[in-house]
Every structure is written in C-alpha cells, then in structure tokens.
Amino acid sequence: MNPNQKIITIGSVSLTIATVCFLMQIAILATTVTLHFKQNECNPPANNQVVPCEPIIIERNITEIVYLNNITIEKEVCPEVAEYRNWSKPQCQITGFAPFSKDNSVRLSAGGDIWVTREPYVSCDPGKCYQFALGQGTTLDNKHSNGTIHDRIPHRTLLMNELGVPFHLGTKQVCIAWSSSSCHDGKAWLHVCVTGDDRNATASFIYDGMLVDSIGSWSQNILRTQESECVCINGTCTVVMTDGSASGNADTRVLFIREGKIIHISPLSGSAQHIEECSCYPRYPDVRCVCRDNWKGSNRPVIDIKMADYSINSGYVCSGLVGDTPRSDDSSSNSNCRDPNNERGNPGVKGWAFDNGDDVWMGRTISKDSRSGYETFRVIGGWTTPNSKSQVNRQVIVDSNNWSGYSGIFSVEGKSCINRCFYVELIRGRPQETRVWWTSNSIVVFCGTSGTYGTGSWPDGANINFMPI
C-alpha cells in the first residue's frame, strides 16, 4: 500500500470513528432529554384539569456529562393536589383522654406581653392544629386590660396561633370579632367573625384570607355563633348561629357555606328550645352538634345536620347525668332525650359531648353551681336511653379547687379513624378574683386514647398575687 493509500485509509477510519462517536453523542443526548421529561410528568387529576408542576428539589452534576452511566437525571417532584375533607373514616374507639397541650398564657403574662383573651378553641388543618381565642385588644400588663370582663367591644379580634404557642405580640389577628368559629375544608381556612352593635351586628365570612360574604343580624339581639370549630364535609361547611334572647325565645339558624359563600340557610327544627355555643363534630356524611340551652334546660341540646338536603333535627342528650352548669344534683337530675329538663336552665356554660354507639362521652365542671373543676366520663346508654346514669371511665382534668370555664370539641383525622379531642378554658381574674381588674384565660387540651393513662390536675396555675393588677 503506497503512502497515499495509507493516508486515505487512515482518514476514512478516523472519519468513520468520528461519525460513530457523533451519532452516539446524539443518542445519549436524546435519551437524557427523554428521561428528563418523563421524570417531569405529573399525573393529571381525574377531571383532566391542567396541574402545573413546580420544582421542589433539583439535583445536578456540576461537570459536563459524557457517558450515560455517569448522568444524574434532574427530577422535579410534583406537589399533591389539595382535596376537600370528607371525614368518612370511623370514630376512634377510646378508653379515655390523654394530655395533649397547655399554653400557660396567664402565668406567662406575669412577666411578658401576652394578649388578654377569652372564648378560646382549637381546630386543625390536615397537617397541624391551631388555637384560637377572642382577644381584647390589649395585653394583660396594660391599663387597657381594666374592664375586660365585658364580652362585646369593637376592639376584640380573632387570634390564631399554632397550638401550644401563647398569644404573644406577634400573633396574627385574623378578623374583627367578639364571636367566632373557624374550620378548614381541606384547601383553606374559613373564619366566621361577628362584630358590631348588639342590635345590628355583622357576621363576616373570610375564606383563604379574603372576605367573601357577610350577613347582618336577623333578630337585632346579639347575633352570635359557636366559639368553637365549624365542620366542613366535601367542601361545604356548616355553622350554627343564634340571634335573640339569651334567656327566652331566640332565632337559631344553620348556615351552609362553600368557599366562603353562603349557599343555604336552614331554620332550627325539632324539639330543642334554646341553642347557643354549639360544639360540632363530623359524623359522616353529616354533622352533629351538642350545645348550650341558656333558658330551660341543664341537659344539653343536640342538633343533627343533614349535609345532603340541609335538613335539621334536634333534641337533647339522653344522659340523666347532665352536662351544663348550674345543674341539679346527679341524684335528682333528669333528661328524656327530647325536651329541656327545666332544671336550673339559666344561665349555662359552653360544653361538649359526643356519641359512642349507645353511650355518650362528655365533659362538665365538677361543681354543679359554678365554673370550677372539670371532669370527663362515659355514660352507658347515655346517647339512646332516657335518664341513663351509669358512669364509667371518669377522669379529673382540673381539680375542684381551681377555675375552669368554657369547653369544646375538635376532631383530628388519623390514618385509620377520627379522634375526638377537647379543650378547657381556664378563666382567671374577674368576676371571681377581684384583686385584679382584668379577665383572661389559658387552655388545657386532651385527646382520646385507646391506651392506658394516669391521674392528675392541670389548672391554670398562675398565682394571682404575682399578677399585674
């Protein structure tokens, strides 16, 4: 082979090798791009709506990649699409309640800037629980705290913090309110906020941080709502509101709200005579509330709300061990499941109970005359049998030598069941403790447990002599 032929042969081989390498690089590039976009794909929702995919974590090689086995594929993780809550899981079977949270707000107020509050409650979104309360527009160590025993002033606002975080100066004021309710539908928070003149108040409906709807007083006598969480099922939320006399005939209505917009209003029906400050919980596919009769009964009213057709029915908790304060002695108290018992019906206190088959779990003050102490127990047959009085699983939450106050229920969805929890308002200051001019509270929170538990007492714990006057 002459020199020219050698040169041509070497050149041809080199060109062939270069062409093969070039084609391999194109194949590698095509494979990389294809794999990248396959990693990037999101499964569309059932209704075929377009869902944008936002990058969460992207891992990259910092050098040029030549060989496929050295390539790190960029992977973008698509966020889960929020869904409405339906609360379709069964209720957890429990043996009692275990301690969950305590905020110690009043004790901390002795040396820190903590809001003056009352009417607290707890509610949870799908991932976290929050505590709410109606602030008085002042901290405790502040001359404005003088006279905060009063319920309705234009400076009251709804406060919201993560559960266990006291209401410090950085706390968010969600809305203007001297009566409120809040709940999360799975996508966003709904807040029902009542404020204004006693004879012409306004309820604002705030959804996902925006004012969406409102309604004015319909009886011109202190429009008011639950002071605990509302309940949302499949995107429709329901809240109980009352306008009218606190010790006589009043007009109670059940409102149905979707993404902040009122879609239906149902009047109260059934045998309940007076409804205030309901504690509501999901009972799929419906909602059930246990309330306060401030007029005729120390047995608690029950409202059953049908979400499908907006129908309402009502009666009273059957247990003869009644839940309101003041009340008659347990040996003489009564309830027939249908009517108020006409036993020390006025005034009353916000409370809770929930059904467990034929039984009822309930909480109440230990004192039958005042808001002191707090206990929980289960009454055998207490949901279905008139005047049932067989009590089991009693627990002391706050001993009888310490003040309690309002209490209410909230629900938490677990992996396999829905747990019931409750909070107790621990009121301090006036009217019982006249050394100081203010009225405020802390809270203690318990949740249902299927395990064992011990004993104790969890009062507010502030020494009133250490507190600002």
UniProtKB/Swiss-Prot annotation:
Residues in compartment: Virion surface: 30-469
Single GO MF annotation: metal ion binding
Transmembrane regions: 7-29
Residues the entry annotates as binding Ca(2+): 293, 297, 324
Biological process according to GO: carbohydrate metabolic process; immune response; viral budding from plasma membrane
Intravirion-side segments: 1-6
Region (Involved in apical transport and lipid raft association): 11-33
Activity regulation comment: Inhibited by the neuraminidase inhibitors zanamivir (Relenza) and oseltamivir (Tamiflu). These drugs interfere with the release of progeny virus from infected cells and are effective against all influenza strains. Resistance to neuraminidase inhibitors is quite rare.
Keyword hit for Calcium: yes
E.C. no: 3.2.1.18
Annotated function: Catalyzes the removal of terminal sialic acid residues from viral and cellular glycoconjugates. Cleaves off the terminal sialic acids on the glycosylated HA during virus budding to facilitate virus release. Additionally helps virus spread through the circulation by further removing sialic acids from the cell surface. These cleavages prevent self-aggregation and ensure the efficient spread of the progeny virus from cell to cell. Otherwise, infection would be limited to one round of replication.
Protein name from the UniProt record: Neuraminidase
